[in-house]
Amino acid sequence: MAGAGLIGIRRRIKSVTNIRKITKAMGLVSTAKLRKARLNLEINKKYYNEYKVILKDIINFIEDSNIYIDGNGSHKKLYVIFTSDSGLCGSFNINIINNVINEIKEDKENSLVIVIGQKGRMYLKKLGINTLAEYIEIPDVPTTKEARTIAKNIIKLYSSKEVGEVFLVYSEFYSPVKQQVLINKILPFTKENKSDNKYIEFNPPVTRFVDEILENYLKATILNCFSNSKASENGSRMTAMNGATDNANDLLDNLDLQFNRLRQSAITQEISEIVGGAEAQR
């Protein structure tokens, strides 16, 4: 009986050891990817923050009517959701999806969705939520090519009045163990009161290149979301894999203890049988 138990435990030890090898390797890969993603995030964040300041000044000095500032009259809301293509990253994707569900459940008829990432597409399909567009297989270091494609689609939907408000839903990266899901409204822009002591002269007039400025700003914003999302994804995956490796180590310790106890019990039983047999022959 003890022999059968020993065989079963030995199989479990082998299985858990193999799993630990996988989780440890994935943790190391995620650590390397996170380092790269954080560097990319820092570079993009500087560019994005500078562009935000410039755009704010430009918008405040636009006096003519403009749909990107005044709105286009549509009641439809567009949510652009940033998720991952791969899994095994803890609650990274489900937290984003849950935030979207809570946001659109009050007004489903006027809510439209663009999803980025295989996992987001899979979750939305299960929930029966249709999408306007899907973008998958985004590289580990997103480029302006991906950002431009999405930005142009957003501008097309907004300028044609198919949507009246645009929100970006993504995970803001703070540290490997802390990320926060944000829902940021990017269209229409919010105009602030002009500062009394500030004047900027534009040549040519700003109205001539507002569309180009808008597209560049949206590209920078989407690239910033991509950078935060990739860093958050890899941080979540690294934390999840390190946690899985620690759990595997704890399980192996318990299995080793069980194995040694059973083996000791089997040896004791065998000795008792030998002694008992010898006593019976006297």
Curated annotation (Swiss-Prot):
Topological relation to the membrane, as annotated: Peripheral membrane protein
Subcellular location: Cell membrane
Gene Ontology molecular function: ATP binding; proton-transporting ATP synthase activity, rotational mechanism
Gene Ontology terms: cellular component: plasma membrane; proton-transporting ATP synthase complex
SUPFAM superfamilies associated with the record: ATP synthase (F1-ATPase), gamma subunit
Keywords: ATP synthesis, Cell membrane, CF(1), Hydrogen ion transport, Ion transport, Membrane, Transport
Record-linked InterPro entries: ATP_synth_F1_ATPase_gsu, ATP_synth_F1_gsu, ATP_synth_F1_gsu_CS
Pfam families: ATP-synt
GO biological process: proton motive force-driven plasma membrane ATP synthesis
Family that this chain belongs to: Belongs to the ATPase gamma chain family.
PANTHER family the record matches: ATP SYNTHASE GAMMA CHAIN, ATP SYNTHASE SUBUNIT GAMMA, MITOCHONDRIAL
Known partners and oligomeric status: F-type ATPases have 2 components, CF(1) - the catalytic core - and CF(0) - the membrane proton channel. CF(1) has five subunits: alpha(3), beta(3), gamma(1), delta(1), epsilon(1). CF(0) has three main subunits: a, b and c.
Function: Produces ATP from ADP in the presence of a proton gradient across the membrane. The gamma chain is believed to be important in regulating ATPase activity and the flow of protons through the CF(0) complex.
Name the UniProt record assigns to this protein: ATP synthase gamma chain
